[in-house]
Amino acid sequence: MKEADAYRRYLETLAPETLPQLSQYVTPDVHFMDPFNDVRGLDALRRVFEDMFDSVQDVVFRVDALGLDGSVALMSWQFSGVLRGRAFTLDGTSKIRFSEGGRVSEHFDHWDSATQFYTHLPVIGSLLSFVRRRIASPDQT
C-alpha cells in the first residue's frame, strides 16, 4: 500500500516545519492514542506533535518494519530525543488504520511507558522498580 509507505516517510521526517502537511496523511477526524494521549481530530493531533517538539529536542523517529493487512498497517519503530537534557530511546509498535481514501483514520502507538519512561523519573521510578521486583517471578535475573 503506497499510502503506508508515504505515511512512514512522513513520520521519519516529521519536524515542526512539516506539521502543515499532516492533513495530507490523516483524516480530519483521525483518532490518535499513545500512553499519554487519546485525541480525535487533525488539530488535536497537530497539537500533540507541537507539544512534543516543544518538549523534546533532537527528535528522531525511525521505522524498523512495516507490515500490511488490508487497510491496517503495523509499524515497529524507535523514537529518540533529548528531554530536559537527558537522551532517551523508546521502542514501540503502531497500529495504523487507513480510510477508503487512503489517509490515516486511526493511529495507536504501543510502548512500555513503565520501563521506558516512568522508571527513569526520580520518585516514581524507584517505586515502580520496587513494585516490579515484588511481583516478578523469582527466576528473573
Give the ranges of each region predicted by the language model:
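Short acidic-aromatic low-complexity motifs
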Residues: 1-28
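Soluble or luminal CAZymes and related metallo-dependent hydrolases
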Residues: 2, 6, 44, 88
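Short, mixed-charge, low-aromatic patches
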Residues: 1-9, 32-35, 49-53, 138-140
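A beta-strand edge to alpha-helix "cap/lid" segment located at domain peripheries
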Residues: 54-60, 68-141
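Bulky hydrophobic/aromatic packing residues
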Residues: 21-26, 36, 77, 109-111
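A solvent-exposed, acidic/Ser-Thr-rich amphipathic alpha-helical stretch
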Residues: 19-20, 27-72
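Generic detector of well-ordered alpha-helical segments enriched in charged/polar residues
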Residues: 8, 23, 46, 125-132
